[in-house]
């Protein structure tokens, strides 16, 4: 049997990584959601692990749905898929729900905690630190208060989501400066918009753009 020399990329995110379809509430086909696009663009030399969960958070524990907290599951996920060459983190939108009343700075701190946890855990378990690509999520649209998710979000979720990019970029920069570990940053909101259907989830064309951009960023490093 030939050894598997492919680079392993773990995509850790929420419903927009899962591939939630705002048109029917189901899941996009593998070739439509952005990790699938990433797989197509990068080609055979890469193994793409899709770890998207609807409602996943980066800094809070959802009431009655603690399993959606992305922090406790992170180490088990990493251990299941190691060795890992790169991790793509795109989280934060669900932390802006009304039940948390969170400031964007809290979300950036959650992302920073995840970056440190990934680096320290995989250094211990596989003897190397993966490249971490922090992707600030697409903004939440102004129409969120009249969308199917209006009960979950306040009107100020939209402007708060617009503050994430600069905070996440600083978090990634600080991590790189402090640890000298490899990492990158991508602002999804500069490339794509959420659907007009629910002001939160992505349409197929946005998945195509995002997956291609992430592939280009990863290819430059890996």
Each predicted region: which residue ranges?
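N-terminal start-of-chain detector that recognizes signal peptides
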Residues: 20-22, 58-62, 104-108, 151-152
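Catalytic metal-binding/acid-base residues of hydrolase active sites
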Residues: 16-17, 54, 94, 138
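Serine-esterase "nucleophile elbow" of acetyl-processing enzymes
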Residues: 1-53, 59-64, 76-81, 87, ...
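Alpha-helical cap/lid subdomain in secreted, periplasmic
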Residues: 2-5, 68-222
């Amino acid at each position: 049997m030939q050894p598997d020399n492919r680079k392993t990329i773990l995509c850790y995110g929420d419903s927009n990584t899962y591939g939630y379809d705002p048109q029917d509430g189901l899941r996009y086909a593998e070739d439509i959601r952005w990790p699938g696009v990433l797989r197509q663009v990068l080609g055979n030399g890469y193994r793409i692990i899709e770890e998207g969960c609807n409602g996943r958070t980066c800094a809070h524990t959802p009431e009655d749905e603690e399993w959606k907290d992305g922090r406790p599951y992170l180490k088990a996920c990493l251990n299941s898929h190691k060795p890992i060459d790169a991790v793509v983190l795109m989280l934060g939108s669900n932390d802006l729900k009304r039940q948390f009343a969170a400031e964007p700075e809290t979300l950036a701190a959650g992302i920073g905690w995840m970056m440190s946890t990934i680096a320290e855990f995989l250094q211990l378990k596989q003897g190397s630190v993966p490249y971490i690509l922090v992707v600030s999520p697409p903004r939440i649209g102004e129409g969120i208060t009249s969308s199917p998710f209006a009960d979950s979000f306040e009107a100020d979720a939209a402007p708060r989501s617009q503050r994430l990019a600069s905070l996440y970029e600083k978090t990634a920069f600080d991590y790189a400066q402090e640890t000298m570990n490899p990492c990158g940053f991508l602002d999804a909101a500069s490339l794509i918009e959420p659907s007009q259907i629910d002001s939160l989830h992505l349409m197929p064309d946005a998945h195509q753009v995002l997956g291609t951009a992430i592939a280009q960023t990863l290819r430059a490093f890996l």
